[in-house]
Amino acid sequence: MSNPLVYCLPDGYTMRPRDFAADPWQYQLVIHRGFDNDGTPEKWDDELLKRIPHANDALKTFAIANREYCAHCGLWYTTGDTAYVEPVATVPEHRKRGLAKAVVYEACSRAHALGAKRAIVLSDQAFYSRIGFTLSSEVYDWEHANSD
């Protein structure tokens, strides 16, 4: 993250400012719809969201159009060198416009300003390599085989 992360939002979209108080229902909808869920979700307990350890609302980025949250990047960072990107979602009708890249770049830039030197994502989706992430390590899931 040593080079500036540059993105361009399409006309009609804005990026959520750092001091913006996110609307919990809009936040829930962008996650629900961005992961291709149908229907209307059951409302989350807003108080529960406030108690998530290490949550930093200034690092939650949203691309917004007409007061609707269209794309989101969550990012976890406390101290040290590493920020963790998770989750990233774009509402289907707003895809293919560069919004996911924009929210990821904005979130990473905010973490960099706080001291993060790198950002990682635990995903091998091609999207992340297209926007500049490179493989730094691999994770293996080991399971014990039953001898039954």
Give a label for each model feature.
Residues M1, A119-L122:
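Short, hydrophobic beta-strand segments that form beta-sheet elements in well-ordered domains
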Residues Y27-H32:
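Hydrophobic alpha-helical core bundles mediating ligand binding, dimerization, or RNAP-core interactions
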Residues D81, K117, T134:
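Short acidic/polar active-site loop segments enriched in Thr and Asp
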Residues K101, S123-W142, S147:
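Conserved active-site alpha-helix within GNAT-family acetyltransferase domains
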